[in-house]
Amino acid sequence: MAWKLDGTYFENCSCEMPCPCTVTFDAGADYDRCQVLLAFNVREGEIDGVDVGGLTAPPVADTPKVMTEGNWKLGLVIDEAASDEQAEKLGAVFSGQMGGPMAALGPLIGEVVGSDRMPIEYEDDGLRHRVRVGDGIDVEVEDVVPFGVESGEPAQLTGVFHPANSTLTIAKSHRGKISAFGMDFDNTGRSGFSAPFAWSG
């Protein structure tokens, strides 16, 4: 039961930029809750011998103001392009059943509100990252290049506890429409992050 995933990640949440919850889970969100989409695009991956490269999984979460209080609501979307076997394997990894970074979040999740197969479009040009899921989700973030930085390199947050990576590039959303699993929010203009991710278990 070995698996390995490599790809790109981005998120968009309801906090102002940058999200204090990402700096540390016990900081407290800017508003009453932290409502977030986490988009993982698997460039290359294999789970128990099943190839899952090219597929996307964007979990949606609604958490209390202080994330460490737990009782998160989590919904998982699996790429409609996945076969039944691929969907089963991805669901096992992203729900934490097969260990890895998502398993570390397990104690914080109070309710898994659903898991759906939906059409997903994922775009990444290096600075802009976008995911569209059916008619309910359309999220795009752009990495932030600080004023005066001639190299064009975006700003980063390092040394954090985060399932995707301990180093995250700071981003801001241009689109933030999220409607799924009974969760409806618009995070346009709010916080975002992006990063490569490499998981194994």
Model-predicted segments: where are they?
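Aromatic- and glycine-enriched beta-alpha-beta binding-site module
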Residues: 32-103
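Intrinsic-disorder/low-complexity loop/linker signature
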Residues: 49, 126-127, 182
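Low-complexity, flexible helical/coil segments
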Residues: 47-54, 76, 110-116, 158-159, ...
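A generic structural signal for short, solvent-exposed coil/turn residues
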Residues: 7, 30-32, 68, 112, ...
